[in-house]
């Protein structure tokens, strides 16, 4: 018998800004909670990694950058106060614009840029396989490179992960549930993946 998982949606905000620091996930979450304190107590709420390009000035944001918050559909309206706000991310200013609701789609191949784990890749793959079995999901997986997020003494580490050959219902279940901890820092959140040969 598989567990009941709440239906999740993505709330997609337009954002404008030049760059964010390398350790932005920690500051970003603190700012979001400052503006919407209700988010802090919801372990299912996640913030998708921003699309950035590395440089000597930090992580550069594209002109059409988006901030995406994934959360249960029943909580989507809690993010409404974010529109029109300005975030201070380690000295970088981000202006949050309009929001729209985006339904999660059942792609057969999905990817998470970091699923929290120890540095033991074999144990990681075994744990992921066991977790998929717990969720009633049958699929193939490819473990990517080891990644980490640093913020002073705080370190979150793990591996990137591709899950493929998913049935539509299993794809939705996994995207709704995620894997591992620290969803608030962008970890364990799955998005569509087009080329399973690129695991960066």
Feature map (PLM): residue ranges:
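RNA-interacting cores
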Residues: 1-200
